[in-house]
Amino acid sequence: MKIEPITGSEAEAFHRMGSRAFERYNEFVDLLVGAGIADGQTVVDLCCGSGELEIILTSRFPSLNLVGVDLSEDMVRIARDYAAEQGKELEFRHGDAQSPAGMEDLLGKADLVVSRHAFHRLTRLPAGFDTMLRLVKPGGAILNVSFLHLSDFDEPGFRTWVRFLKERPWDAEMQVAWALAHYYAPRLQDYRDALAQAADETPVSEQRIWVDDQGYGVATVKCFARRAAA
Ligand SMILES: C[S@@+](CC[C@H](N)C(=O)[O-])C[C@H]1O[C@@H](n2cnc3c(N)ncnc32)[C@H](O)[C@@H]1O
């Protein structure tokens, strides 16, 4: 089963949810601040979805050179329209996070390459990390936060997840999408192996993979690495 791009009514539902719940991005923004994001930097957001993170980041760091990339034409269109509505000039590209095709101008140029809540959808996880490490400049950092497979949840974590799904006042479509996303998500060891494989091609000087919740009870995997200096 393929759950990669989010298209059609699911893309619209995702945008409705995301644009009404900016606080859900706070934890990720805090991680980016910890990773050293600063005004004037070049930042690439792989699997950017409908552009909520871009609106939040450019409000806080107005001179970021920020490029959002998504495999879904629908998401790219929604992100462009949303940015225009918000009076922002932002760049969104159609592209696959599993290949730098269409991002050649950014190879080795980004200070930070990020991805939020999407890498669990990739069919080729090592290729996703490979793209991140190729885009980032020597000494720059990558940060991915995505979902963990259900079998890696402990018992209380699983119960919290079920309660979260039931209680969340979402569109039914989003509830099913979330359940499927966790069902098809990689295991923690898959994340470790994928990052290690990518780091064989583009060496890293520092890396850390850890799991914690997002303050609303759902475990996510965090993957940070710094590309070795030239
Ligand atoms: C749950 S959304 C997250 C969007 C955004 N990062 C956020 O946090 O709001 C996952 C996004 O990943 C995109 N996606 C899935 N596979 C992709 C791939 N191989 N390359 C680029 N985007 C992809 C989907 O189209 C969707 O927009």
Curated annotation (Swiss-Prot):
Keyword tags: Antibiotic biosynthesis, Methyltransferase, S-adenosyl-L-methionine, Transferase
GO terms for MF: methyltransferase activity
Class of the enzyme per the UniProt entry, highest EC level: transferase
Biological pathway: Antibiotic biosynthesis
Lineage top rank: taxon: Bacteria
Methyltransferase is among the record's keywords: yes
The EC number(s) this enzyme carries: 2.1.1.-
Signal peptide annotation: none
Keyword Transferase: yes
Record-linked InterPro entries: Methyltransf_25, SAM-dependent_MTases_sf
Pfam families assigned to the protein according to its UniProt record, in alphabetical order: Methyltransf_25
Listed GO biological process terms: antibiotic biosynthetic process; methylation
Described purpose of this protein according to its UniProt entry: Mediates C-methylation at the 8-position of the aminocoumarin moieties in coumermycin A1 in the biosynthetic pathway of coumermycin antibiotic. Active on both mono- and bis-amides for mono- and di-C-methylation adjacent to the phenolic hydroxyl before it is glycosylated by CouM.
PANTHER family documented for this protein: TRANS-ACONITATE 2-METHYLTRANSFERASE, TRANS-ACONITATE 2-METHYLTRANSFERASE-RELATED
Stated family: Belongs to the methyltransferase superfamily.
Name of the protein: C-methyltransferase CouO
Protein species of origin: Streptomyces rishiriensis
